[in-house]
């Protein structure tokens, strides 16, 4: 995604979710793709929902969304955002933390969510956490912080009901950020949606359960065994 490839941006445009959705449209145009199957994980799911808002689904055949809420920020009437408790004030504080120490703020957000293993890994500062800290510290934080502000300003709940193509939803049963209530909300809001919750895996169910995910995708596309 724009601003996330480990290389600096070549132009000053802010990598908002709207800009990333247009990037997807530009990609489809460049390769002359129609009836595409598109997978969006985390920020990618938000980008795909923005794409649907801006461009519709006429060029898409099927959609796959992985472990994401249609609105990240919570309020008194919306408990299905980040950790069920991430209101505007907490988001503003998080953005301040990103400005101060981008890498550590991201690591803490992941660690102090719903997944106790992630918390233990952070508190023990295991090698994987150290490596992640080094990778995050090497990034230019400015475009990523601007991107986050764009993502947390978005609300795609109204988009879900407009989706006319089949959707596969894959959520982690031990997601760092979302409970099953979020998964069920998304499933119930999309007219033709199939939900799989992978038990005991975090925000990246497609990575922890690669073989199952591949089978589920092939079955969803009609290319599975039998």
Task: For the regions a language model picked out, list residue spans one by one.
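Short beta-to-alpha linker loops that shape the active-site pocket of alpha/beta-hydrolase fold enzymes
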Residues: 1-3, 69, 201-202
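Active-site loop/oxyanion-hole signature of alpha/beta-hydrolase fold enzymes
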Residues: 1-43, 52-59, 207, 212-218
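Conserved catalytic-core motifs of eukaryotic protein kinase domains, centered on the activation segment
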Residues: 7-13, 74-77, 180-181
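Flexible "cap/lid" loop of the alpha/beta hydrolase fold
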Residues: 49, 53-54, 58-101
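Conserved alpha/beta-hydrolase catalytic His-Asp/Glu region
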Residues: 74-81, 96-161
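Conserved serine/cysteine hydrolase catalytic core
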Residues: 137-188, 197
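Catalytic active-site module of serine/aspartate enzymes centered on a nucleophile-bearing elbow/loop
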Residues: 192-226
């Amino acid at each position: 995604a724009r601003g996330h490839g480990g290389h600096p941006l070549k132009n000053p445009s802010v990598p908002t979710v709207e800009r990333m959705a247009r990037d997807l449209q530009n990609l489809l145009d460049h390769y002359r793709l129609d009836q595409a199957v598109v997978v969006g994980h985390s920020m990618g799911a938000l980008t795909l929902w923005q794409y649907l808002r801006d461009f519709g689904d006429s060029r898409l055949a099927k959609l796959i969304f992985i472990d994401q809420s249609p609105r990240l920020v919570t309020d008194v009437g919306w408990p299905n955002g980040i950790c069920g408790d991430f209101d505007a004030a907490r988001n503003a504080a998080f953005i301040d933390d990103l400005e101060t120490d981008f890498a550590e703020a991201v690591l803490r957000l992941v660690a102090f969510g719903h997944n106790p293993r992630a918390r233990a890994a952070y508190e023990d500062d295991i090698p994987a956490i150290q490596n992640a800290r080094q990778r995050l510290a090497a990034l230019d934080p400015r475009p990523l912080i601007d991107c986050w502000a764009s993502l947390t300003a978005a609300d795609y709940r109204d988009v879900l009901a407009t989706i006319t193509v089949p959707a596969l939803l894959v959520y982690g049963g031990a997601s760092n950020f979302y409970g099953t209530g979020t998964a069920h909300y998304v499933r119930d809001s999309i007219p033709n949606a199939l939900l799989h919750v992978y038990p005991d895996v975090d925000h990246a169910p497609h990575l922890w359960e690669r073989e199952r995910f591949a089978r589920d995708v092939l079955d969803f596309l009609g290319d599975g065994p039998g």
